[in-house]
Amino acid sequence: MMNIYLDIDGVLVGTASPMSDIVDLLEYILERFPHSTYWLTTHCRWGSNQCAQWLKQNGLPKPLVCRLHRTVRPTHWQTLKTEAIDFSIPFVWLDDALLYSERAVLRQHHAQDGVFLMDPRDDQMALKALAYLKSIGD
């Protein structure tokens, strides 16, 4: 079992990756990790899940947004996103910008390898993330 943690801005929206590649990435995640995928974004903080509205406003297909809303679980965190990570289970965290203090928490837990850093300017980034997830399996 592996947890997947998803940021939105710079990862799924506001990125150079074509929408079709982002859809492929999300479809793969929903298919392979339906019970262990979590939002780790400012749009879902303190358990308040505003992700579906934000994704719809930013052009993700409505049927996919509905599936994401039903499947991807909200997280509870206040200051650092790492507060929501379960370090007892292997994970992949897709994010574009980690805070220095979040990196320090990852180092404390020897979990730096759990982060897949996304570059929103790279139009191949969603494909690279998909290839990475496929390479590590579940």
What are these regions (language model features)?
Residues 1-76:
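Alpha-helical substrate-recognition element adjacent to the catalytic core
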Residues 49, 53-138:
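C-terminal cap/substrate-recognition subdomain and adjoining C-terminal extension
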